[in-house]
């Protein structure tokens, strides 16, 4: 009999995987960025493994790295998520499809329309990852000289969310009567004009897409700063975070769920999915050897550049074999910066060691071992309220994905921790989330 609490599994995937050197690993697909057949194979494998969702991160600029590091990066280019995911919807039936869209460098009408369309095309499997953009270079692609200040980005994001969800509620679920005899296509009493005028946004509406199948696509958030946690507690239904140990995971889980209670939201209406970088082997030693080989393929310039991006500060001129000095505040991601600073101080890491870590597993929790040891750790996190599931990162593709689906998933199922079949038809139903009521009808 299945346990009362079941793991939720998302897949955090970039075309050639998360690890900086994944594209160089033996058997990897180095051309995956623009090879649709590879994406099709990835999502169909995820669906075979009964994953809840495929999550596609996105940036609206090339990463802010020196050219000696940038030229080694396989993530410099990728498909636009909201162009790719509708195509992937056609080759899948159950897998949720979550795309990133920035609230800083988009307009809410565009976002509402695209995600509503994706939800209809996928028969109710869309999710919106709400981000405020951490890459300062994005500003220069949208007519700005400087990135919008962190607090201002989150204030705009809160209003942006209200507008987008309001636009999704433009129509009652039964507005489109399509009466052939009378010639009436929709009931005019069941259309709402939003007419929003706020601090940052002015949007009239209504949306020219029917209400999404799920009511709203699932709302996802990934910020772990104070502002990010509060926004998640108020609005999110899934949150991605990146603690690298159970204690930090439990602390984050309790904090966000506690904020929800204070806001009158059910704690079950938000799923906390920390990132987990998973390497599978027949033995722990074999799994570690895979990780060691992968890490050996990371050029030092790439590791230093990745660390600089995460800290929002160029560390290339620092003593690489010395401790991380005090790093000034920046307008990049505050949660990523703070996590790495805390880790460096706590574990007495040198700048070089920290760069190797970030360039390898993206600063996430590492689960390196056999199917049994990995399942044991996942079970402990779930049972001790460190998470509701995981946003799994694969070390290389397709091999790392195949290892997880073919070896770890059966062990999780054997322990009655994970589904054998999908429970519902929509992403909300599979995540155990309610369908939002229309606020206007």
How does the language model describe each region?
Residues 2-4, 47-48, 85-93, 119-125, ...:
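Acidic (Asp/Glu)-rich catalytic clusters
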Residues 10-13, 28-37, 74, 84-97, ...:
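Hydrophobic, small-residue-rich alpha-helical packing segments that form membrane-like cores
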Residues 9, 46, 50, 88, ...:
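Conserved, mostly hydrophobic/aromatic
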Residues 22-37, 100-109, 145-147, 213-226, ...:
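Active-site mouth loops of central-metabolism enzymes
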Residues 7-11, 54-56, 95-101, 124-130, ...:
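Hydrophobic faces of well-ordered beta-strands that scaffold small-molecule active sites
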Residues 69-97, 261-263, 401-420:
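Alpha-helix-loop-beta-strand connector modules within alpha/beta enzyme cores
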Residues 1-91, 214-217, 340, 441:
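N-terminal beta1-alpha1-beta2 module of alpha/beta enzyme domains
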């Amino acid at each position: 009999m299945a346990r009362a609490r079941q793991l939720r599994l998302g897949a955090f995937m970039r075309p050639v995987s998360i690890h900086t050197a994944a594209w160089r690993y033996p058997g990897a697909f180095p051309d995956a960025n623009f090879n649709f057949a590879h994406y099709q194979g990835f999502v169909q494998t995820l669906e075979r493994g009964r994953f809840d969702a495929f999550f596609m991160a996105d940036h609206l600029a090339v990463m802010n790295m020196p050219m000696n590091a940038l030229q080694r990066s396989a993530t410099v280019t990728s498909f636009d998520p909201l162009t790719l995911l509708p195509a992937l919807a056609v080759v899948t039936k159950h897998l949720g499809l979550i795309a990133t869209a920035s609230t800083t460098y988009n307009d809410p009408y565009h976002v509402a329309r695209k995600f509503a369309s994706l939800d209809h095309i996928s028969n109710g499997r869309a999710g919106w990852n709400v981000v405020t953009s951490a890459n300062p270079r994005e500003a220069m692609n949208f007519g700005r000289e400087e990135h919008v200040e962190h607090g201002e980005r989150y204030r705009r994001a809160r209003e942006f969310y209200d507008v987008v969800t309001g636009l999704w509620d433009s129509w009652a679920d039964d507005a489109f009567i399509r009466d052939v005899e009378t010639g009436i296509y929709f009931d005019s009493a069941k259309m709402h004009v939003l007419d929003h005028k706020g601090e940052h946004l002015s949007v009239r509406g209504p949306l020219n897409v029917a209400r999404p199948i799920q009511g709203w696509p699932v709302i996802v958030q990934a910020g772990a700063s104070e502002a990010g946690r509060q926004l998640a507690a108020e609005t999110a239904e899934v949150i991605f975070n990146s603690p690298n140990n159970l204690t930090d995971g439990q602390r984050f889980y309790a904090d966000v769920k506690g904020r929800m209670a204070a806001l009158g939201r059910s704690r079950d209406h938000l799923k906390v999915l920390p990132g987990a970088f998973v390497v599978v082997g027949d033995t722990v030693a074999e799994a570690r050897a895979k990780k060691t080989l992968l890490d050996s393929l990371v050029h030092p310039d790439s590791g230093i550049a990745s660390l600089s991006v995460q800290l929002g500060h160029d560390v290339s001129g620092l003593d690489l074999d010395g401790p991380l000095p005090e790093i000034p505040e920046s307008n990049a991601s505050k949660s990523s910066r703070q996590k790495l600073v805390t880790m460096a101080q706590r574990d007495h890491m040198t700048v070089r060691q920290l760069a190797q870590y970030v360039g390898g597993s993206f600063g996430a929790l590492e689960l390196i071992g056999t199917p049994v040891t990995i399942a044991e750790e996942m079970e402990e996190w779930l049972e001790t309220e460190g998470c509701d599931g995981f946003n799994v990162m694969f070390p290389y593709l397709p091999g790392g994905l195949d290892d997880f689906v073919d070896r770890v998933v059966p062990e999780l199922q054997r322990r009655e921790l994970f589904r054998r079949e999908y429970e519902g038809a929509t992403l909300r139903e599979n995540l155990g989330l309610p369908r939002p009521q229309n606020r206007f009808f």
